[in-house]
A protein has these predicted regions:
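Compact integral membrane and secretory-pathway proteins
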Residues: 1-144
Length: 144
């Protein structure tokens, strides 16, 4: 019977982050109120994020890349390299989440529930990526 590898949970965390990008990450009540999601969609009167490719779009691209790397690690396709890449990408996503907060959250802009969902997903992705990396490297050591 096959066992469930930790890398599949990294895939789940990346999917949660990907979906959370469309949830409200920023909210405001100033000027009539408004919300913005991580990918730049705005509703109401909110000035941030500015138009163009930004941190939120980069997070979506990297979370898609994390899905691929973690799935490769879970399936055993270059598991050591893929699990190391998954850890690197998940740490980078955590840094980008912090950077998003530093760039856009200041009074009267507050974080929305999507930011919390995405932040928790990235934190879990880092922890689970470490477990996936340990599992991949220890499994490769047993085969030799």
């Amino acid at each position: 019977m096959a066992r469930l590898r930790p890398a599949w949970f990294v895939v789940l965390c990346a999917l949660v982050l990907l979906v959370s990008a469309w949830l409200p990450w920023l909210t405001t009540s100033a000027g009539g109120g408004g919300r913005a999601n991580a990918i730049g969609g705005k509703l109401g009167q909110i000035a941030v994020p500015p138009p163009g490719f930004g941190v939120g779009q980069l997070m979506v691209v990297l979370s898609s890349t994390l899905i691929v790397a973690a799935a490769m690690a879970a399936r055993g396709l270059s598991a050591r390299i893929a699990s190391t890449a998954a850890l690197s990408i998940s740490v980078l996503l955590t840094v980008l989440t912090w950077w998003y907060f530093r760039l856009y959250v200041a009074p009267p802009i507050a974080v929305g529930y999507g930011f919390y969902v995405g932040g928790v997903a990235t934190a879990f992705a880092v922890v689970l990526s470490v477990l996936a990396m340990v599992a991949a490297w220890s499994e490769a050591g047993r085969r030799r």
